[in-house]
Amino acid sequence: MVATDISRAVQGLSGVPVTVEVDVANGLPSFTIVGLTGRAIQEARERVRAAVRNAGFDFPQRRVTVNLAPAEVPKEGSGFDLAIAVALLRTWRELPLDDVACIGELALDGGVRGVIGVLPMARRLAASGIRRLIVPGENAAEAALVEGTEVIGVESLAVAVAYLEGRVDLAPVAAPPMGEVGASGGVDLAAIRSQALAKRALEIAAAGRHNLLMLGPPGAGKTMLARALAGLLPDLDADEALEVASLYSLRGRLSDRPATSLRPPFRAPHHSVSRAGLIGGGAGIVQPGEVSLAQPSVGLSHMRLGAQRRDLRAHHHGPRHPASDEAERCTLLQRFLFGFGTHPGHPVSAAGPWPGRGPAPAP
């Protein structure tokens, strides 16, 4: 017998709804998962097997095959566990799954653990026509921000099955109101004494969304001025706030910033941040970098002007490879206002020498 369920594969802020197909057939007992899966999904076999048994259900002693379709889409992460288990149980139980998608990682005792990236997953599933989401309880609040979707938070596989069978009535999670005050990193410009010229530069940069270079010795107030620049920017609208919250959800950093906050974010990465940490990337699930987390507000970087400038230039121009050499491309939002702070001893002129590199390259 074949049973199906719906989940989703993450690709940056977009993605593809994934159909989980389970076939239970006669043969030697086995459990196979196919469909261009990553290591975390292959390990789901042991998590699902243990969770199903410890939740009080029988695991079939037959040949079990799970297919994650479409097969050409790479799939990573543990968020498919719940969908696989529900589809498996559906092979011998009546579980209505019309317009329902399941997201969540299973614990060995049958509990449901939270995963990163639930908000962008919920947005994409809602756009594809899914009207009901079953997610881990700790992710329910962020998923409920998506309009037109009924979000059910569950703490265990047994509760999810009981809800689908109609034995338990779970109320949909109410969406928290947008506009909740959150940590934006902003500083009141009026709290900064003197610095009249710098304040004027901040006002011009905020009004025209111009990038800003601040040159001064340590302790001159460059970081405080950059935080004040974030405070000068207007509130985000609802769509922008959801985009920002989706980026933080994908990075697993919603604890740093409430998903309902309308204030522009502020990021100040350390000068030793790697290129991947700055512009994003990674294998499997692509992680947004600091410049993506700063959009559409302020990103501040200190010192090491040459290295950071080379990284940003390389990111701007992109790799010079033909399209045929690219297996996959992922685009992340990177629309931000860049504030740069450096010391007088560092080269800041395009015409000046760069440390260890000779004359600066043409801008």
Predicted regions and their residues:
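Conserved AAA+/SF3 P-loop NTPase catalytic/coupling segment centered on the Walker-B
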Residues: 270-274, 287-320, 337, 347-361
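Walker A/P-loop
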Residues: 213-258
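The Walker A (P-loop) glycine that initiates the GxxxxGKT/S ATP-binding motif of P-loop NTPases
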Residues: 216, 280, 302
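Peripheral, non-AAA+ core regions of ATP-driven protein-machinery
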Residues: 1-213, 217-224, 326
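Conserved alpha-helical scaffold flanking the Walker A/P-loop in AAA+ ATPase domains
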Residues: 203, 259-266, 276-299
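AAA+ P-loop NTPase catalytic core and its hallmark functional loops
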Residues: 233, 238, 243-246, 250, ...
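Conserved catalytic network of the ASCE P-loop NTPase/AAA+ motor domain
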Residues: 25, 56-59, 94-95, 127, ...
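Short gly/ser/thr-rich secondary-structure transition/capping motifs
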Residues: 89, 280-285, 321-327
